[in-house]
C-alpha cells in the first residue's frame, strides 16, 4: 500500500499521512492514530531510500572487498555488519574478486545508489586511483591495502608483527626461517600493500639476527618449494606464513609426508582466523584484530560522514602473537 492509498482510505491529504508516519507537524491524536492503524493493518512499508534521499542521508554503507571465501574477509564483514546495525546503518556488500575494473565499477554503482560512505579493501593503488576515489564525492575509508597518502586508512602494523615473529622464532631455537608470502607474485599486478609491509618487516628482522638463515618464497607454487627447502635443510627450520591458510596448507602437505608441525619443523601463521581452535596441533599465529580494524574503520567513516574535523585519518593498530603448539 502507498501513502496515496492510505490518504484515500482515511479521507485525509498525503501531507497529513506523511506527518503521521514521520511524527512531524501538527495533527490531532485521533487522526494520527487512524492513519497509523490503517498503515499497519495494510502492511505499509516506507520507501527508505526515497526518504533517505529526501533527507540527504540513506543510512546505507557500501563495503567492497575481495571475496567471502577468504576467512579474514568473512570475519571482517561480520564485524562491520554488527558495527553498522548497532548504529542504525545497513551495509551493502559487493566483491571485486581482485579485478581492478570490477572494483571501479562497483564503487561507481554504490555512488549511484547514494550510499552515505564506503569501506574498501582495494586491489588498486596510486595517485590516479586516488583522484578517482576523490571524484566519487563520498567518504571512503580503506582497510589493509593503502591506496595513497591522504586517503583514510585503517590497518594493523604488519611490518612490526612479522619482525617480532622472526625474533620469537629465533629465540625458540630455530636456525633457519622460511618466509612464505605467495601474493608477492602479484606485486606488479595489483595492490598487495599488506604483504609488502610484512615482507619488509621480515627482511629488517633477519638482518639483525646474526647467523639466522632465511629463504623467501613468493610464488603460488609455495607448497612444492617449501617441501624442497625442508628436505634439504640441515638446520632446525621454521616457516613464517603471511596467512593462516598458507600455513594450514603446508601442515596438511607435510603430514602426508610423515612430518609433524612443532616436531619436525616449526610454523607460524598470520590472521588468527576463527576456526583455528578446531585445528590440531594448534597453530601459533599473529592476531591482526579483525574486529578492532572493523570498529576503527567504521568509527572513522562515521566521523567523516558527519563532517567532523578528523585530525588523524590513518589508524595503525598493533598485533599480538597467539601461542600455539607449532613453534
Segment roles from a protein language model:
Residues 16-19, 53-69, 176-188:
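Short beta-strand segments enriched in small/hydrophobic residues
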Residues 42-117, 196, 203:
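Amphipathic helical "hinge" segments at domain boundaries
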Residues 64, 119, 238-240:
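Structural motif
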Residues 125-134:
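Active-site-adjacent beta->alpha loops and helix N-cap segments on the catalytic face
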Residues 50, 104-107, 130, 166, ...:
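Short hydrophobic/charged patches on amphipathic alpha-helices used for structural packing
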Residues 1-59, 72:
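N-terminal helix-turn-helix DNA-binding module of bacterial transcription factors
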